[in-house]
Amino acid sequence: MQATATTLDHEQEYTPINSRNKVLVASLIGTAIEFFDFYIYATAAVIVFPHIFFPQGDPTAATLQSLATFAIAFVARPIGSAVFGHFGDRVGRKATLVASLLTMGISTVVIGLLPGYATIGIFAPLLLALARFGQGLGLGGEWGGAALLATENAPPRKRALYGSFPQLGAPIGFFFANGTFLLLSWLLTDEQFMSWGWRVPFIFSAVLVIIGLYVRVSLHESPVFEKVAKAKKQVKIPLGTLLTKHVRVTVLGTFIMLATYTLFYIMTVYSMTFSTAAAPVGLGLPRNEVLWMLMMAVIGFGVMVPVAGLLADAFGHRKSMVIITTLIILFALFAFNPLLGSGNPILVFAFLLLGLSLMGLTFGPMGALLPELFPTEVRYTGASFSYNVASILGASVAPYIAAWLQTNYGLGAVGLYLAAMAGLTLIALLLTHETRHQSL
């Protein structure tokens, strides 16, 4: 059963109980940490962890084991969405957001402090895997809560704009994570970086967590949740209610996120791998050159996120997403071979800039659209669950599927794969209702 839409009264009074700036900063900082952590772990999992946390007999096996710990977070995220969603819908948004940020932050700092295999043996990879699971658990509850914090405190007609602030965490986290590693590579020797320098970004994230906690603790509870709590309308088991009474909208919400996840991981992880791999497997471009291209292209991503929020508030959340998803399909069908496949650095950069700008346009409205699909009593659980299940279907496998398709069928097949995933998103969008005028 899908939640019914309630039309907003154009004359509805809006009395904010939380400072606008606090709401926006509190919703942004958690997702910024989320993506910062993702990129520093992804980088370290390839270049550092195989040498620090795993036996040195077989370098290939050590790298694969390291990447397996990276994948653990994708398994943990839906579990985190169920756990934190339960308390977010039962106890409140504020307390749950503080708990998810603490879980994520402590796990990240622990990774930066862990001794290696040479010191504690087999306990090193086990503790790394446990800390990575803790990261994923916290991440599973972070995005949904941040999106609700923004949208449930937003004034009428500005929900997509407010909801775009958690989405800004993706380009900000990406930019600072890669910038941190570039800075460390300039300041330290390879020996210094492998000895202790890699730990700096993980430990530094504690500063961001402390700032986020300070802002979140000072907030009042979401006014939308307070109404439900006062009326004692919380459900006993939000996940059970979601999967029995709101199955259709949960499935649609998951498929709506597919194009976003697939596009992001193809534009970042796969494009980096393909561009830097030696010919004939890849383009053979220098790693630092491609990293700089990605960092510059991510600026386009960041600019387009709030632009997409403004457009969605003006023309409709669902309608704008239908148009943007159609543009992603066209990009997927016509941009891969002429731009990325050219090997020309200028055209490769144009490909990255165009793709990541589209990423900003599709990711921006999600902070409002997904929460709007669910009623208040299961909104935290529903938005988080759809978002994180989609990460398994779209994010975790996209780079591997893309690499396999390119090896066996050519670069055009990667574009067809992205177009197919965006097509599923387009169908899901067409099966949902417009949510812009819906009351939360």
Regions found by a protein language model. Name each.
Residues A45-R77:
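Extracellular/periplasmic helix-loop-helix junction of adjacent transmembrane segments
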Residues L102-I120, T326-S342:
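C-terminal ends and interior cores of transmembrane alpha-helices
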Residues R90-L102, A314-T326:
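Cytoplasmic membrane-interface "Motif A"-like loop-to-helix N-cap segments
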Residues G212-L219, M421-L440:
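Multi-pass alpha-helical transporter architecture, strongest
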Residues A42-T43, H246-F301, G394-A398:
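Extracytoplasmic gate region of multi-pass secondary transporters
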Residues R318-P365:
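C-terminal transmembrane helical hairpin of 12-TM major facilitator-type secondary transporters
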